[in-house]
Amino acid sequence: MLTLGELAKKLDAELIGEASHVVDGLGTIQSAGPSQLTFLANPRYRSFLEQTNAGAVLIPESQREFCPVPALIVKDPYLSFAKASAFFEVAPQVQPGVHPAAVVDATAQIHTSASIGPNAVVEAGVIVGEGAVIMANSVVGAGCHIGDQCRIWPNVTIYHGVTLGPRTTIHANCVIGGDGFGFAFNGAGWTKLHQVGGVTIGADVEIGAGTTVDRGAIEDTIIGDGVILDNQIQVAHNVVIGDHTAIAGKAGIAGSAKIGSFCLIGGAAGIAGHIEVCDKVQILAMSLVSSSIKEPGTYGSALPVDSQSRYRRNVARFRNLDDLARRVRKLERLSD
């Protein structure tokens, strides 16, 4: 619960309205009530702004005259709304200490302010930093280092030899440090290449539910500072992801791929192994990246949806492209 005056100071915003007005939650611009904060970032939704009943709206200067309720004028309304969300988050309360039902090896080093939940397992040699939280049923393997203020949600499995930087969040059902997909064909079957590397995850990383990050075959799989990974992403062994890259759900990154910093990768995109993607690349959803990308920019390869009849006709034409290309070359030679 904050007054608009307090919010304006925290967000470095210009307040239009009563500084004493109190907001106690967040809402959409269509549904927010008199005690809720909302935002308008896209001018296409101005009609919602003109009809809103919100307690206050975060808006850019250009929308000042259209706002019928108290406003907070900011440069980037969505960014300011994201910052404001931290003031209203209702997160589960945890208490420092080790739950009686947790299993913690005697050699583990647990900071006195850390919290270990029921049925969690913390194996030998683990270091758990100040204010870190390991919730119910999660397992932290031998020799791991869990940084200060990390939050590991329930049912996470972190294999041995994994390092989490400070303030990193791992959501439920993630597996960090499982074996990479390394096998050598021996003529009659497969011989496993034992994965002896680890996983190093930087500071301020967020990894969504059900995502898997495999350990390195020899050297570590590395995820840089500030990376955000959505739900159900596969990161294979020895992948390197640069700082502040964002990857949407169901993307798959094959072994030893290197992705630069400040990249945006859309949902269900596939990155082939042993290639490099430079900094500041945007890859559209469902695209297949089969070779290295050396220039920043936006790239895509997926076909957009179409009616069934048009799609089937286009597929038929696609199958004839090779023959068509030969005919065109023949005509070009005849015309010379």
Swiss-Prot record:
Protein name, as recorded: UDP-3-O-acylglucosamine N-acyltransferase
Gene3D superfamilies per the UniProt record, alphabetical: 1.20.5.170, Hexapeptide repeat proteins, MurE/MurF, N-terminal domain
Entry annotation: catalytic residues: 237 (proton acceptor)
Keyword Glycosyltransferase: no
UniProt entry tagged with the keyword Ribosomal protein: no
Organism: Alcanivorax borkumensis (strain ATCC 700651 / DSM 11573 / NCIMB 13689 / SK2)
CDD domains: LbH_LpxD (cd03352)
A GO molecular-function annotation: N-acyltransferase activity
Catalytic activity: a UDP-3-O-[(3R)-3-hydroxyacyl]-alpha-D-glucosamine + a (3R)-hydroxyacyl-[ACP] = a UDP-2-N,3-O-bis[(3R)-3-hydroxyacyl]-alpha-D-glucosamine + holo-[ACP] + H(+)
Keywords, ordered alphabetically: Acyltransferase, Lipid A biosynthesis, Lipid biosynthesis, Lipid metabolism, Repeat, Transferase
A UniProt-annotated Pfam family: Hexapep
Function noted in UniProt: Catalyzes the N-acylation of UDP-3-O-acylglucosamine using 3-hydroxyacyl-ACP as the acyl donor. Is involved in the biosynthesis of lipid A, a phosphorylated glycolipid that anchors the lipopolysaccharide to the outer membrane of the cell.
Gene of this entry: lpxD
